Amino acid sequence: VLSPADKSNVKAAWGKVGSHAGDYGAEALERMFLSFPTTKTYFPHFDLSHGSAQVKGHGKKVADALTNAVAHVDDMPNALSALSDLHAHKLRVDPVNFKLLSHCLLVTLAAHHPAEFTPAVHASLDKFLASVSTVLTSKYR
């Protein structure tokens, strides 16, 4: 459960991401594909090379979903319901992949915002991304 301090940290950190959200989403995906090659199996139709338009496009989708989750941090299950359905019933993404992408997103944010990425912000973002992952996998059962 996210505390009021966690919610404040997440909103402040994501606010600093701003117009770079799509780029950071794409960078996190690239990190995931390079660090965890098995994740590529969910994207057989994508050009997974560095800077590809498809990875950038999906990175923007990831970032937009996270922006939506931040905006609705007190009601993520409703805000992410359609996305949860998509990943559980159509795409059938292994839930472990959400953890891998979350890790890569944390690394990306830390690399771009080292001064703001304090231990408290890191912990809050980690809890937030875990909450998003829980919501996205809630319909797998």
UniProtKB/Swiss-Prot annotation:
<keyword id="KW-0813">Transport</keyword>
<feature type="modified residue" description="Phosphoserine">
    <location>
        <position position="138"/>
    </location>
</feature>
<feature type="modified residue" description="Phosphothreonine">
    <location>
        <position position="134"/>
    </location>
</feature>
<keyword id="KW-0408">Iron</keyword>
<dbReference type="InterPro" id="IPR002338">
    <property type="entry name" value="Hemoglobin_a-typ"/>
</dbReference>
<feature type="modified residue" description="Phosphoserine">
    <location>
        <position position="35"/>
    </location>
</feature>
<comment type="function">
    <text>Involved in oxygen transport from the lung to the various peripheral tissues.</text>
</comment>
<dbReference type="InterPro" id="IPR012292">
    <property type="entry name" value="Globin/Proto"/>
</dbReference>
<feature type="modified residue" description="N6-succinyllysine">
    <location>
        <position position="11"/>
    </location>
</feature>
<dbReference type="GO" id="GO:0004601">
    <property type="term" value="F:peroxidase activity"/>
</dbReference>
<feature type="modified residue" description="N6-succinyllysine">
    <location>
        <position position="7"/>
    </location>
</feature>
<dbReference type="GO" id="GO:0020037">
    <property type="term" value="F:heme binding"/>
</dbReference>
<dbReference type="GO" id="GO:0005506">
    <property type="term" value="F:iron ion binding"/>
</dbReference>
<feature type="binding site">
    <location>
        <position position="58"/>
    </location>
    <ligand>
        <name>O2</name>
    </ligand>
</feature>
<feature type="modified residue" description="N6-succinyllysine; alternate">
    <location>
        <position position="16"/>
    </location>
</feature>
<dbReference type="InterPro" id="IPR050056">
    <property type="entry name" value="Hemoglobin_oxygen_transport"/>
</dbReference>
<dbReference type="GO" id="GO:0005344">
    <property type="term" value="F:oxygen carrier activity"/>
</dbReference>
<dbReference type="GO" id="GO:0019825">
    <property type="term" value="F:oxygen binding"/>
</dbReference>
<protein>
    <recommendedName>
        <fullName>Hemoglobin subunit alpha</fullName>
    </recommendedName>
</protein>
<keyword id="KW-0479">Metal-binding</keyword>
<dbReference type="GO" id="GO:0042744">
    <property type="term" value="P:hydrogen peroxide catabolic process"/>
</dbReference>
<feature type="modified residue" description="N6-succinyllysine">
    <location>
        <position position="40"/>
    </location>
</feature>
<feature type="modified residue" description="Phosphothreonine">
    <location>
        <position position="137"/>
    </location>
</feature>
<comment type="similarity">
    <text>Belongs to the globin family.</text>
</comment>
<feature type="modified residue" description="Phosphoserine">
    <location>
        <position position="49"/>
    </location>
</feature>
<dbReference type="GO" id="GO:0031838">
    <property type="term" value="C:haptoglobin-hemoglobin complex"/>
</dbReference>
<feature type="modified residue" description="Phosphoserine">
    <location>
        <position position="124"/>
    </location>
</feature>
<feature type="modified residue" description="Phosphoserine">
    <location>
        <position position="102"/>
    </location>
</feature>
<feature type="modified residue" description="Phosphotyrosine">
    <location>
        <position position="24"/>
    </location>
</feature>
<comment type="subunit">
    <text>Heterotetramer of two alpha chains and two beta chains.</text>
</comment>
<feature type="modified residue" description="Phosphoserine">
    <location>
        <position position="3"/>
    </location>
</feature>
<dbReference type="InterPro" id="IPR000971">
    <property type="entry name" value="Globin"/>
</dbReference>
<dbReference type="GO" id="GO:0005833">
    <property type="term" value="C:hemoglobin complex"/>
</dbReference>
<dbReference type="GO" id="GO:0031720">
    <property type="term" value="F:haptoglobin binding"/>
</dbReference>
<feature type="modified residue" description="N6-acetyllysine; alternate">
    <location>
        <position position="16"/>
    </location>
</feature>
<dbReference type="InterPro" id="IPR002339">
    <property type="entry name" value="Hemoglobin_pi"/>
</dbReference>
<dbReference type="Pfam" id="PF00042">
    <property type="entry name" value="Globin"/>
</dbReference>
<keyword id="KW-0597">Phosphoprotein</keyword>
<feature type="binding site" description="proximal binding residue">
    <location>
        <position position="87"/>
    </location>
    <ligand>
        <name>heme b</name>
    </ligand>
</feature>
<keyword id="KW-0561">Oxygen transport</keyword>
<keyword id="KW-0349">Heme</keyword>
<feature type="modified residue" description="Phosphothreonine">
    <location>
        <position position="108"/>
    </location>
</feature>
